[in-house]
Design a protein with these regions (language model features):
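Short capping/connector residues at structural and topological boundaries
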Residues: 16, 80, 127-129
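Residue-level preference for alpha-helix termini and adjacent loops
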Residues: 19, 54-55, 74, 123-127
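Residue-level signal for pocket-adjacent positions within structured domains
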Residues: 15, 70, 122-123
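Metal- or metallocofactor-binding catalytic centers and their adjacent structured scaffolds
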Residues: 5, 39-119
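Structured beta-strand/loop patches that form or line metal/cofactor-binding pockets in enzymes
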Residues: 1-45, 51-55
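Catalytic pocket of metal/acid-base enzymes, prominently hydrolases
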Residues: 115-129
């Protein structure tokens, strides 16, 4: 089962602060967030979420979008069931320290496990052990 491509959809979640005052923390009202869809050559797909804590990782929506574009090309043709190989392909394209890379890889990772679970008829928690 080979990866035929990635699709992503930008979300616009709103953050509601409960305990912090504006002068304590810089707390954005929105987070960079995407749903990530990894589709296999047989039509099956998995869904993941890539949401960054912008105040901690410093990753913007545009950076995540750029990484998703790079990963889309890098992952086409890769074995969808070999998650470690997919991570190597992503890291070879956009290194772990590049803004957007960590968040994006986590969303693709979730989508890959969802896809593999669907292909094997197993929930993701059974794959992870």
């Amino acid at each position: 089962m080979e990866i035929s491509g990635l699709e992503w959809f930008r979300l616009h979640p709103t953050i509601f602060k409960e305990a912090w005052t504006d002068d304590e923390f810089v707390w954005p009202s929105r987070l960079p967030s995407f749903l990530v869809k990894v589709t296999a050559d047989d039509g099956r797909y998995g869904i993941g979420e890539a949401t960054s804590q912008i105040w901690y990782l410093g990753e913007t929506g545009d950076q995540i979008d750029a990484c998703l574009r790079a990963y889309d090309g890098a992952l086409r043709g890769c074995d969808a069931e070999n998650v470690a190989l997919a991570h190597r392909a992503m890291e070879a394209t956009v290194s772990g320290g590049m803004p957007g890379g960590r968040t994006t890889r986590s969303g693709v990772d979730m989508a890959l496990y969802d896809l593999v679970g669907k292909a094997r008829g197993l929930p993701v928690h059974a794959l992870l052990g």
